[in-house]
């Protein structure tokens, strides 16, 4: 395998997103930001996320070969062996948990493990090929990253981290179902029961809209409960309204174009919420 293929195995963009999620959990409860702690937390989360990604590559190599988007992945092409992948995944997870425990505490390490367990065992192995609820349950993997970040600072302040974890949990279906509409033919070809394959694009678009309504409501809870201030509340309300606008258009037009726009819009929405948490707490 080439160096580039090893990097692809790690799914670095997802790893970075998980790290940013943990940093947000850290920032939500910290009274001041320790750059060294943030660096160590980032590294631990990247290691844990990368471990889950490698396992996903190994387990899904058969269906990856059937989908245009994933057919060139290293495990799908045979560039890497399952034994190599499993070994790398174990090493990365052990390293991530060891770092989390040494730099912070066992609670951070536990949440790191639980996030990986949900993604690997519950989503990848159990639900992905069996039921359309796969991505709903799998969304809990990101929620554990928020809790890990919070536990790195204080293991007693749980209300705000739990609400933010709920936001992450609700964000995942709205984000991923848009992608699933875009890639419905791929999933159908591979026999993966993503929601658009099961109920069609139109009903999926309605599900996205309904889910986002709940998501935006949940995102306003930190402001409504007085856990965060007006800066966060304003950002959550405006960005939520914009995302809902994209969802409404998707309900009217379920073309690949608007599915792609909805998928793309969900990313800056979450990033803006992350920034707003930090802005409200530390700036």
From Swiss-Prot:
It comes from the Bacteria. Pathway: Porphyrin-containing compound metabolism; heme O biosynthesis; heme O from protoheme: step 1/1. Coiled coil: none annotated. GO terms for molecular function: protoheme IX farnesyltransferase activity. Its main location: membrane. The chain crosses the membrane at residues 14-34, 35-55, 84-104, 107-127, 133-153, 163-183, 208-228, 231-251, 258-278. HAMAP family: CyoE_CtaB. NCBIfam families: cyoE_ctaB (TIGR01473). Converts heme B (protoheme IX) to heme O by substitution of the vinyl group on carbon 2 of heme B porphyrin ring with a hydroxyethyl farnesyl side group. This is Protoheme IX farnesyltransferase 1. The lineage of its organism: Bacteria, Pseudomonadati, Pseudomonadota, Alphaproteobacteria, Rhodospirillales.
């Amino acid at each position: 395998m080439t160096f580039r293929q090893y990097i692809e195995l790690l799914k670095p963009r997802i790893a970075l997103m998980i790290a940013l999620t943990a940093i947000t959990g850290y920032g939500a409860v910290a009274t001041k930001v320790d750059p060294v702690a943030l660096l160590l937390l980032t590294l631990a989360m990247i290691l844990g996320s990368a471990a889950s990604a490698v396992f996903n590559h190994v387990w899904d190599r058969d269906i990856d070969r059937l989908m245009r988007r994933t057919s060139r992945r290293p495990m799908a092409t045979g560039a890497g062996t399952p034994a190599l992948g499993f070994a790398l995944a174990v090493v990365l997870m052990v390293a991530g948990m060891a770092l989390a425990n040494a730099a912070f505490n066992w609670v951070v390490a536990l949440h790191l493990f639980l996030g990986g367990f949900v993604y690997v065992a519950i989503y990848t192995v159990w639900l992905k090929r069996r039921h359309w609820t796969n991505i709903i349950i799998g969304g809990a993997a990101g929620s554990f990253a928020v809790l890990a970040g919070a536990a790195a600072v204080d293991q007693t302040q749980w209300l705000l981290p739990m609400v933010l974890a709920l936001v992450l949990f609700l964000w995942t279906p709205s984000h991923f179902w848009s992608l699933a509409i875009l890639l419905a033919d791929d999933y159908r070809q591979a026999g993966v029961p993503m929601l658009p394959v099961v109920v069609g694009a139109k009903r999926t678009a309605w599900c996205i809209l309904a889910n986002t309504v709940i998501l935006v409501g949940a995102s306003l809870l930190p402001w409504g409960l007085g856990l965060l201030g007006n800066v966060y509340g304003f950002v959550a309300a405006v960005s939520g309204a914009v995302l809902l606008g994209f969802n409404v258009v998707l309900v009217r037009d379920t073309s690949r174009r608007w599915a792609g726009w909805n998928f793309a819009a969900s990313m800056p929405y979450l990033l803006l919420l992350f920034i707003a948490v930090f802005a409200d707490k530390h700036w």
